[in-house]
């Protein structure tokens, strides 16, 4: 089960990356880690740093993917984004997005 969940998550991140790049985002990092925290995708627009949390679910789930982003996850993401900005000395506004994907049964 954990392996399948990881595979679905990684596939979702690949789709999200392609989606963002097609819309003019420059992807800087995928799965950037800070301690136990992780930023799924860090991307850049000309005047904005964008931190993207990617949530991918099997279509059989009852919950919507974005419902998995609770207050604790938001706090961890903000802490990791703060570390990212400090690590790379970035002086841009930061936008936080959730990209929600539902895997179809046909692939």
Whereabouts are the PLM-identified features?
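Acidic-basic catalytic patches of nuclease active cores, encompassing PD-(D/E)XK
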Residues: 1-30
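Conserved catalytic cores of phosphodiester-cleaving nucleases, focusing on short active-site segments
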Residues: 20, 39-60, 65, 69, ...
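Solvent-exposed beta-strand sheet faces enriched in polar/charged residues
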Residues: 31, 55, 97-99
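Short acidic/glycine-enriched loop/turn segments that link adjacent beta-strands
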Residues: 34-37
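Amphipathic, hydrophobic secondary-structure cores in small proteins
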Residues: 64-71, 91, 95
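Domain-level recognition of nuclease-like catalytic cores that cleave nucleotide substrates
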Residues: 86-107
């Amino acid at each position: 089960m954990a392996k399948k969940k990881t595979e679905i998550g990684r596939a979702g991140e690949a789709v999200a990356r392609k989606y963002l790049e097609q819309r003019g985002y420059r992807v800087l990092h995928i799965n950037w880690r800070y301690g136990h925290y992780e930023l799924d995708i860090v991307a850049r627009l000309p005047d904005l740093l964008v931190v993207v949390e990617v949530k991918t679910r099997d279509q059989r789930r009852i919950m919507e993917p974005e419902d998995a982003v609770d207050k604790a996850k938001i706090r961890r993401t903000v802490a990791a984004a703060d570390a990212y900005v400090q690590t790379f000395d970035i002086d841009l506004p930061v936008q936080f997005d959730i990209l929600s994907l539902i895997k179809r049964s046909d692939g």
